[in-house]
Amino acid sequence: MSGFKSDFLRTLSERGFIHQISDESGLDELLAKETVTAYIGFDPTAPSLHAGGLIQIMMLYWLQQTGHKPVALMGGGTGMVGDPSFKDEARKLMTEDTIAENMASIKRVFANYLTFGDGANDALMVNNGEWLRNINYLEFLRDVGRHFSVNRMLSFDSVKLRLDREQSLSFLEFNYMILQAYDFVELNKRYGLRLQMGGSDQWGNIVNGIDLGHRMGTPQLYALTSPLLTTASGQKMGKSLGGAIWLNADMLSAYDFWQYWRNTEDADVERFLKLYTTLPLDEIARLAELGGAEINEAKKILATEVTAMLHGRDAAEEAAETARKTFEDGELSENLPTVGVHKATLNDGIGVLALMVLAELCTTNGEARRHVEGGAVRINDEPVSDPRMVVNAAALNGQGLIKLSLGKKRHVLIRPA
């Protein structure tokens, strides 16, 4: 059992969310005696967050569930600069229109985890572009910039590692940590916010905000970071061989999302159940005791629970049933991901490599070729050995479909359109 007084820190500790806290006892006391407003920042660098950001969303979820007020800060302003933390090179700058489109797309996911509204602990979604776009540069340098030591900023690992490799760090990117620190102070002024959370790579940026707040007269501010997660085999969370595991349903189907979690390594099952589901800890402990083939039942529960939170219980159970029919009963379920191919194209024939790319099982013909040559590709459960193979309408089965498979667990139905 953890020694925390507050429900929030106790929950995070028991479930493995905590990496560092700036003032553990002070934050615990504050959370135990009053409703605390806390935030996590999200940069709109793509139309969707991916599964690597899910741990941050779950932290906001538990914050609200334990009686506090979560704020999801969208980086409409800082997104135009780009976070240089632990990046090897500068990010490409995005247009205002792209940022706005990405923010609108990302917002839809949060409603599945948080309750928004005007209540004391209802969630807020805020765009830092509201205040950053209107900053007077000279006033900002005088009032905020004077509190920052360049010597200290150069000592942060996020910057130091980049410079040690003799990689360029632009003045634009260097300003990112100042803007993020200012966000913390501005959010305190606007919403009485006291806590910023994030991944462990954000520790330096968050502590900068605490220091700036102290120098600018805010109440005591706090930092809490979560560990940067990798799988037991060292792979980054949110990535798979097929690409990013997006949270938006229009970028990754509920079935493919379910499959990602079903494929969790044995050594990660207990940890992921604690972090990504709301199952009681005693139930998680029971599932963690399963061994041998039974561990697969725990993986199915993990996949279904994580998918239910994001896509809804019906979509999660449909994905689980589709997988059961496909892998256990050998049936061809129409709930598998489906790609339409024009009838004329099928009649003329399409190369298997191009079909793999079209079905989004691979990103390039070269990748598809390697899978074919490695014996991982099947059409209607028959192995494909020739990368020059042409697939045409003759491959349609009695249901008018072609089943295209990569490995044992990735299947797409090709349907004439």
From Swiss-Prot:
Its primary localisation, in coarse terms, equals: cytoplasm
- For this protein, what is the EC number? 6.1.1.1
Q: Where is this motif: 'KMSKS' region?
A: 236-240
**Which biological process annotations from GO are given for this protein?**
tyrosyl-tRNA aminoacylation
Binding-site list for L-tyrosine:
39, 176, 180
Motif 'HIGH' region covers: 44-53
| Secretion signal span | none
Family under the similarity heading: Belongs to the class-I aminoacyl-tRNA synthetase family. TyrS type 1 subfamily.
Q: What is the designated name of this protein?
A: Tyrosine--tRNA ligase
